[in-house]
């Protein structure tokens, strides 16, 4: 339905002063001669003719004038989600009270839904309560804004811009819709970096074996849960979600390790991998040490750039939305999401670091080298004590299919 409410204007407001000038130019009507009897005058009985301004004012106040048309238009605006009668503009779109409350509840509680059909259920006035997954999907598709729920009521005609709080307390000052996208990426983090553990934030601290394994599990959990919460990823086919995470989990792990300044001391890593428990050949020791060195180098190079929280979120989204994953059902859509993430990073860097013109390029150049860290080595170093020979790809698939990473059956995350 075409929206004309916001553009309709009162005729008196269209040309200010035009109608008043017409009234002032009308010739004066002579009064009755002195001594003539006073008789009330009514229209059509010799009284002064109505001026255009008076006529317009009278028609607007009448029951059939444009003023009543405006009220009727406002009363007949439909909810863009279900087609019910809209109660106004909520979170960026005209919606009914039911869809407004559903969207607010879903976003504030960070609820996750599952569709029992093919993720294409009809959402109308009579079926809107049958599938919460498809209802929330349609809310987002028509343009309802998650960030508007987090920040409270927003002016209906103002674009989403201003400051968005980062996890490290820095303000995000971007003036476009991409800043809202970054804000959603940040809010998708299941918990802030500081909750990875106090040992993680102390570079000179040598962590014990159990702490290393627990921290690694938290970072893997964080990567999967973050992906489940970011925009557009839950809308992909579950097979595409699994394919993307199975390919990129090790790169996301390295980014998380750099973000939380994970201590990477050789001796505890070798102990966590169980390599002290059995004798190894010299060649195997050298090869393993090389892999640890590569891991350390990638983490240190990222730390040297002083990457902030928003940049890490964009980098992880660029890594995740890769068309290199096998068997994707919609390669073009995944590529568009990667491009969106890259544009968001570029705009953010240009806005926040205007004196570092090469920063955006340096950040992007770090991504290809993340794949030099072998995923099998990460498994051997951090996860063999927890899950034995169970492949990480199997854990990721199980976490996605179970609907929540909080319930993965391999260890208890506090």
Swiss-Prot record:
Xref: Pfam families: Hormone_recep (PF00104), zf-C4 (PF00105)
Single GO molecular-function term? nuclear receptor activity
Q: Where in the cell is it found?
A: Nucleus
Q: What is its main location?
A: nucleus
Composition bias, Low complexity: 38-54
SUPFAM superfamilies on file? Glucocorticoid receptor-like (DNA-binding domain) (SSF57716), Nuclear receptor ligand-binding domain (SSF48508)
Q: Which chain segments does UniProt annotate as zinc-finger regions (NR C4-type)?
A: 79-99, 115-139
Keywords in UniProt for this one? Activator, DNA-binding, Metal-binding, Nucleus, Phosphoprotein, Receptor, Transcription, Transcription regulation, Zinc, Zinc-finger
Q: Which residues carry this modification: Phosphothreonine?
A: 51
Q: Please name the GO terms of the biological process aspect recorded for this protein, alphabetically.
A: anterior/posterior pattern specification; blood vessel morphogenesis; cell differentiation; female gonad development; fertilization; forebrain development; in utero embryonic development; interneuron migration
- Which SMART domains does this chain map to? HOLI, ZnF_C4
Annotated stretches, region: Important for dimerization: 337-414
Ranges where the record places region Interaction with ZFPM2: 117-414
Specify the DNA-binding region ranges: 76-151
Q: What does this protein do?
A: Ligand-activated transcription factor. Activated by high concentrations of 9-cis-retinoic acid and all-trans-retinoic acid, but not by dexamethasone, cortisol or progesterone (in vitro). Regulation of the apolipoprotein A-I gene transcription. Binds to DNA site A. May be required to establish ovary identity during early gonad development.
How is this protein named in the record? COUP transcription factor 2
Q: Gene encoding this polypeptide? A: Nr2f2
């Amino acid at each position: 339905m075409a929206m004309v409410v916001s553009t309709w204007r009162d005729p008196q407001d269209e040309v200010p002063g035009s109608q008043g000038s017409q009234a002032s130019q009308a010739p004066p009507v002579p009064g009755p001669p002195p001594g003539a009897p006073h008789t009330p005058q009514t229209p059509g009985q010799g009284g002064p003719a109505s001026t255009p301004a008076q006529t317009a004012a009278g028609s607007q106040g009448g029951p059939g004038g444009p003023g009543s048309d405006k009220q009727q238009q406002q009363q007949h605006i439909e909810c863009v989600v279900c087609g019910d009668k809209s109660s106004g503009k909520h979170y960026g779109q005209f919606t009914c009270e039911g869809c407004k409350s559903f969207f607010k509840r879903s976003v504030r509680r960070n609820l996750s839904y599952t569709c029992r059909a093919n993720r294409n259920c009809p959402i109308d006035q009579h079926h809107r309560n049958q599938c919460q997954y498809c209802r929330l999907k349609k809310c987002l598709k028509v343009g309802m804004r998650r960030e508007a729920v987090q920040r409270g009521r927003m002016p209906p005609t103002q674009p989403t811009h201003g400051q968005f709080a980062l996890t490290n307390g820095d303000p995000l000052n971007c003036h476009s819709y991409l800043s809202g996208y970054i804000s959603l990426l940040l809010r998708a983090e299941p918990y802030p970096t500081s909750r990875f553990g106090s040992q993680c934030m102390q570079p000179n601290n040598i962590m014990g074996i159990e702490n290393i394994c627990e921290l690694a599990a938290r970072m893997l959990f964080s990567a999967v849960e973050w992906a489940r919460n970011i925009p557009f990823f839950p809308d992909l086919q579950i097979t595409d979600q699994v394919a993307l995470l199975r390919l990129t989990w090790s790169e996301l792990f390295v980014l998380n390790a750099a973000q939380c300044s994970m201590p990477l001391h050789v001796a505890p890593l070798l102990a966590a991998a169980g390599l002290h428990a059995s004798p190894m050949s010299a060649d195997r020791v050298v090869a393993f040490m090389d892999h640890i060195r590569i891991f350390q180098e990638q983490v240190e190079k990222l730390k040297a750039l002083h990457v902030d929280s928003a940049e890490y979120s964009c980098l992880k989204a660029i890594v995740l939305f890769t068309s290199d994953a096998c068997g994707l059902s919609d390669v073009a859509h995944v590529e568009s999401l990667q491009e969106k993430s890259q544009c968001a990073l570029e705009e953010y860097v240009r806005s926040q670091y205007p004196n570092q013109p090469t920063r955006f390029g340096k950040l992007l150049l770090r991504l290809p080298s993340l794949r030099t860290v072998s995923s099998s080595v990460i498994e051997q170093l951090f996860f063999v004590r927890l899950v034995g020979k169970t492949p990480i790809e199997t854990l990721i698939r199980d976490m996605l299919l179970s609907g929540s990473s909080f319930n993965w059956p391999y260890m208890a995350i506090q």
